[in-house]
């Protein structure tokens, strides 16, 4: 079991229950899933780029990504409905906790010119979204084998009802929020 999951069960649950006055531990917010998304717009002209992006995503997440397809045709972007234009991975359970641990402890500190994550990137329902400009911050990606530097979106979906609860949950995991 991931250390972060043990820490959540032993310390964070009690801390948040006390802070927000929950009657049962089932009311305490928890992380439900982490979604990684990589849009590869250049895949229209070169299919190899999407394969490389999917391989990077598989290395980062530890599971095979789902290839996302265009929902409708857009002439301005030269895409048709059904064209593969990106990939995504949804992490739950043990893989989710392991990824979150790697993200907080290893990857986020490796971001260039890092001054903390934006504390206002919550969606109003306690879910947090962040963008990463370079996939090379993850230790699983070998810098020499990267064909192109790509970014990805990371969404942490929680069971929190408000942004305040979600922020308290992530802050309990020592998320490096900007002051």
From Swiss-Prot:
Pfam families: Ribosomal_L5 (PF00281), Ribosomal_L5_C (PF00673). GO terms for cellular component: ribonucleoprotein complex; ribosome. GO terms for molecular function: rRNA binding; structural constituent of ribosome; tRNA binding. Keywords: Ribonucleoprotein, Ribosomal protein, RNA-binding, rRNA-binding, tRNA-binding. Belongs to the universal ribosomal protein uL5 family. Part of the 50S ribosomal subunit; part of the 5S rRNA/L5/L18/L25 subcomplex. Contacts the 5S rRNA and the P site tRNA. Forms a bridge to the 30S subunit in the 70S ribosome. This is Large ribosomal subunit protein uL5. It comes from Aeromonas salmonicida (strain A449).
């Amino acid at each position: 079991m991931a250390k972060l999951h043990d820490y959540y069960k032993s310390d964070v649950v009690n801390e948040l229950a006390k802070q927000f006055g929950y009657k049962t531990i089932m009311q305490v917010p928890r992380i439900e899933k982490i979604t990684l998304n990589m849009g590869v717009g250049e895949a229209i002209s070169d299919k190899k780029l999407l394969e490389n992006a999917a391989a990077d995503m598989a290395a980062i997440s530890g599971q095979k990504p789902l290839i996302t397809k265009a929902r409708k045709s857009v002439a301005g972007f030269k895409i048709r409905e059904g064209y593969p234009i990106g990939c995504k991975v949804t992490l739950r359970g043990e893989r989710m906790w392991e990824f979150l641990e790697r993200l907080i402890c290893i990857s986020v500190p490796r971001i260039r010119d890092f001054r903390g994550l934006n504390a206002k990137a919550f969606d109003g329902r306690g879910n947090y979204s962040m963008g990463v400009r370079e996939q090379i911050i993850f230790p699983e990606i070998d810098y020499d084998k990267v064909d192109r530097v790509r970014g990805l979106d990371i969404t942490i979906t929680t069971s929190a009802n408000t942004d305040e609860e979600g922020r308290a949950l992530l802050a309990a995991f020592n998320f490096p929020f900007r002051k």
